C-alpha cells in the first residue's frame, strides 16, 4: 500500500531528501502513522533510519537553515527538532534484549524489521518510507492496519515475552484500549493477567503517567475496569480494588461501590475535561471499605467516609507519585465536601446552609456540584428525578445568595489586624474568637456581609469579653 497522498507535506519530502543525501533508508513510525488511519491530529512525528539518527537529523537541520535548533542526546542515539509547530524525533533502527530484573533493554543497531519487532503493539509497528524511491510505501509486517480496522490491541510477538520484558506495556495496552476504544485481544489480555506481578519492577512515576492518560480518556471507566479484570488494579491501586463487591446480610445489601465509582467517573467525564475533578470522582468513596458497618436498624452504613477519605488521600498520592500540591488539596476538598449538597437536597434548603457551602467550597463550588450530581446512580428513576430536581433548587439558591451576599471566598469585613489595633491587643485567642463570631454571624444570615454591621457586632462581642476600645 502506498500512502504518499497522506504524507504529501513539505517536511516529509525534506526528511526524505536528507535521508537520500546521507544514504540511509528512513521511515515515519509509531503513533503518527497510527493516527493517520484513525484520523486523529498529531504534532509528534518519530522517524527511524537504518543508520545514525543523529546524523540524519543534523543533515535535515542543515537543509532547514541556521535558525533551526537541534537537540542531540548522544547517550540515547536520538535527536529532536521543531519545524512549524511539529516535534520531530530521529533515532537509528534498533534491536533489543532484556534482563528479567529490569525493563531497560540492551540495545544494538538493527534493521527496520528489528525495530518493528521491538514495538509494543501491532498498531504502533507500522512504518511509512520517505526516501524518494519508495516515498509513501507502508511497511506492515504484523498486520497492524488490519488490527486497526478490527479495533484490537495485539502484540507483534509472543505477548508473554513482550510483557515480561517490559511490564509497562501492560499498562500501555489498557491505556491504548481506553483512549482508542479498542478491545485487547483475549490472548494478549490473558498474558497481561499471567504477567501482572512483573509490574513491581516499574517505577511508580511511569505507572502514574499511564493512569493519568487513562483518566483523561473519553470513557475512563473502561481502563479501570480492565485493570481490575486483569489483576493489575489490586497491585497498583489496592484502595480502589477494595471497593469491588456487594455484601448482603439479613437480606439487606449495599451497592458495588467500585461499579458505582465507575459510573460517577464517566458521568463527570461527560461534563468536564478537568483531570483533577475526575480524580476526585475516582476517590470520592475511597474510604467506604474502611468505614463500612452493619446494624439491624439502619443496615449498611459508611459514616464519615468523606472525612476519612480526605485523610487517606495524601498517603495514596505519595505512594502513587501523584502531585503532592494544590491538585491533591483540591481532590481532598471535593472528597470531604461531596456529601454536603446531598444533605441539602434531603432537607429544606436554608440560606445559612447554602452560605456555608459557598464559603467552604469557594471557587470549586461548580466542580463540586458536577461531582455531586454525578453521584446520583440509583436504579430508582423517581429517586434520581427527585434528587436532580432538588439539586436545581440548590443551584438556584447558590446563584441567588452569591449575588446577594458575595460569600464565595469571602473574608469578614474586619480582619485580625484591625481588631488588635482597635482593642490594643497582641495576637491572642480573643482575636480569633471575635473573627469566628463575625464569620458565623454572616454565614448564618444574622448580619449582612457589610463593614458597618460587622463593626457593631465586633464591639458587642468585645464588650462581652471585657475588652475596651483604645482606637476609634
Residue ranges and their predicted role:
Residues 1-472:
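Catalytic cores of the polymerase beta-like nucleotidyltransferase superfamily
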Amino acid at each position: 500500500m502506498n500512502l504518499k497522498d497522506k504524507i504529501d507535506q513539505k517536511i516529509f519530502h525534506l526528511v526524505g531528501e536528507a535521508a537520500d543525501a546521507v544514504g540511509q533508508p528512513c521511515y515515519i513510525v509509531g503513533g503518527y502513522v497510527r493516527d493517520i488511519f484513525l484520523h486523529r491530529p498529531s504534532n509528534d512525528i518519530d522517524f527511524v533510519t537504518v543508520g545514525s539518527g543523529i546524523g540524519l537529523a543534523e543533515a535535515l537541520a542543515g537543509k532547514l537553515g541556521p535558525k533551526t535548533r537541534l537537540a542531540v542526546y548522544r547517550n540515547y542515539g536520538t535527536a529532536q527538532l521543531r519545524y512549524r509547530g511539529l516535534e520531530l524525533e530521529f533515532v537509528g533502527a534498533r534491536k533489543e534484549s532484556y534482563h528479567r530484573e529490569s525493563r531497560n533493554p540492551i540495545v544494538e543497531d538493527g534493521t527496520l524489521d528489528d525495530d518493528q519487532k521491538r514495538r509494543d503493539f501491532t498498531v504502533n509497528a507500522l512504518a511509512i518510507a520517505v526516501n524518494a524511491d519508495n516515498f509513501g510505501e507502508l511497511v506492515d509486517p504484523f498486520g497492524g492496519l488490519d488490527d486497526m480496522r478490527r479495533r484490537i490491541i495485539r502484540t507483534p510477538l509472543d505477548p508473554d515475552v513482550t510483557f515480561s520484558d517490559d511490564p509497562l506495556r501492560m499498562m500501555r495496552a489498557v491505556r491504548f484500549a481506553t483512549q482508542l476504544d479498542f478491545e485487547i485481544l483475549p490472548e494478549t489480555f490473558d498474558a497481561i493477567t499471567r504477567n501482572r506481578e512483573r509490574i513491581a519492577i516499574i517505577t511508580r512515576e511511569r505507572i502514574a503517567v499511564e493512569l493519568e492518560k487513562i483518566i483523561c480518556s473519553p470513557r475512563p471507566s473502561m481502563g479501570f475496569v480492565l485493570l481490575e479484570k486483569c489483576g493489575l488494579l489490586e497491585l497498583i491501586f489496592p484502595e480502589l480494588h477494595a471497593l469491588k463487591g456487594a455484601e448482603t446480610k439479613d437480606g439487606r445489601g449495599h451497592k458495588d461501590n467500585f461499579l458505582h465509582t465507575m459510573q460517577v467517573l464517566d458521568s463527570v467525564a461527560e461534563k468536564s475535561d478537568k483531570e483533577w475533578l475526575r480524580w476526585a470522582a475516582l476517590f470520592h468513596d475511597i474510604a467506604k471499605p474502611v468505614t463500612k458497618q452493619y446494624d439491624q436498624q439502619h443496615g449498611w452504613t459508611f459514616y464519615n467516609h468523606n472525612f476519612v477519605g480526605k485523610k487517606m488521600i495524601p498517603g495514596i498520592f505519595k505512594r502513587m507519585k501523584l502531585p503532592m500540591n494544590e491538585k491533591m488539596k483540591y481532590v481532598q476538598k471535593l472528597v470531604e465536601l461531596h456529601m454536603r449538597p446531598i444533605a441539602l437536597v434531603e432537607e429544606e434548603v436554608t440560606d445559612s446552609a447554602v452560605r456555608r457551602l459557598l464559603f467552604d467550597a469557594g471557587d470549586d463550588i461548580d466542580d463540586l456540584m458536577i461531582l455531586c450530581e454525578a453521584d446520583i446512580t440509583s436504579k430508582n428513576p423517581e429517586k434520581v428525578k427527585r434528587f436532580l430536581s432538588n439539586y436545581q433548587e440548590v443551584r438556584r439558591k447558590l446563584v441567588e445568595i452569591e449575588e446577594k451576599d458575595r460569600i464565595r471566598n469571602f473574608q469578614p469585613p474586619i480582619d485580625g489586624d484591625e481588631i488588635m489595633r482597635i482593642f490594643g491587643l497582641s495576637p491572642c485567642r480573643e482575636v480569633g474568637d471575635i473573627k469566628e463570631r463575625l464569620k458565623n454571624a454572616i454565614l448564618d444570615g444574622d448580619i449582612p456581609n457589610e463593614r458597618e454591621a460587622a463593626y457593631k457586632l465586633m464591639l458587642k462581642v468585645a464588650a462581652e469579653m471585657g475588652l475596651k476600645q483604645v482606637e476609634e
